[in-house]
Amino acid sequence: MIVMKFGGTSVQDAQAIDRVAAIVRERLHERPVVVVSALAKITDQLLAMSSAAGAGKREKALELSRAARERHYNCACDLLGTHAFEQIAPELEADFDGLDELLRGVVAVGELTPRTIDTIAGFGERVSSKIAAAAFSQRNIEAAHVDSRKCIVTDASFGKAVPQFEETDARLAETVKPLLERKRVPVMGGFIASTREGIGTTLGRGGSDFSAAIIGAGLNAERIEIWTDVDGMMTTDPNLCPDARRIKNISFEEAAELAYFGAKVLHPATLLPAIQKNIPVLILNSRNPKCEGTRITATAPKSKNIFKAIAAKKRITVVDVVATRMLMAHGFLKSIFEVFANHRCPVDMVSTSEVSVSVTVDSNESIAAIAADLAKLADVKYEGRKAIVCLVGENIKSTPGIAAKVFSAIPDANIHMISQGASEINIGFVIDEDAVPDVVSRLHRTFFSQVDPEVFA
């Protein structure tokens, strides 16, 4: 069996879902499980209505909900026709009525908890999966809607819940396997899960990819397909560099580094369950299904190019901690990293010297609070509007003088930090955010003007 995950732009309207149904039909002989995201932009709209309700703006929240309701009704009606839509309409109506009730409740209580945000944020996938299942059935695909919250079990870390794989695997075997055995196509919402007590959670933004990998690993899928609106993983962001090339084959390790450092095609956590079970992951384009996309496997063919790709991660803050007397004291570095851990703030890059330690983190609203806690230990300063540029490729470890080659291509760039990853397959550095287009373009011209046809398209 295989898992096919379709992102928000792949299910953004009736025409897109119709395309998805045609793609799924081509794969029926492989016993697919289909995972769908919310309709494009709906999660943002849901978060906006939850914020409005939390701020006591009742009418604003309900107005956004009305717009979302209308969009889903129109999409379902266009897909199914009036008669079939009338069969699904009562269920959709009950779902949206429940959403409105929840929004009114938030306004009445005057409190918006992380638990409630998760309940509201995951609404899009609950509804899109029902609409997709109904559309498949009408197109002679024997589909069955499966509520992912009954299958994927997580802890109660609302906003970015952590899967409990053993319990999840057991529930998938109980719920999804019997449908596959009866030649049905299970249709599930991505991103959403629940605690073992049944409280709704989400897997973090972009978590539908993660859902697909969790389901694929739990059911020992032959492969996991991530369907997007691009032809696969590219040598860099085509918006920054129009001559970016498609990567045909890439290793799990290289893809994970790229996903972590800003390649938006893939959620960084997606690959972990797939790596553990050695399940290939394919990145494909629902608007161009004939394209072979990118294949991610444990080991990829050797490339004649040093690098596989260049990624840029914006909205980075550099935090400098200076402590002339304390830095080498026993346990001091541990104290620094505990501050970041307590704020649930992951660190990207680290650089140490005799008297200071510099780290990069994603820019967010908790930076000031982190700095205040660090100031109890040492002198602290931080600067935002930075970006990490990362070059990834397994040939890095066997190429001498790699840093010299990279930095001679961008001699006038203002570089704040340099790091070579412990994996030895990436070299990263920090620059000003507004320098990203120029730096990435020059690096791409230097390292990808000629490419290995076995690895790049």
PLM features per residue range, with description:
Residues 39-40, 150, 230-232, 281, ...:
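Glycine-rich beta-alpha junction loops
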Residues 251-297, 302-322:
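A conserved active-site cap/scaffold subdomain adjacent to cofactor or substrate pockets
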Residues 223-227, 281-283, 348:
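Short hydrophobic alpha-helical runs that function as membrane-insertion/retention elements
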Residues 1-266, 271, 430-432, 451, ...:
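Nucleotide/pyrophosphate-binding catalytic subdomain
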Residues 290-457:
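A conserved regulatory-domain signal marking ACT and ACT-like small-molecule sensing domains
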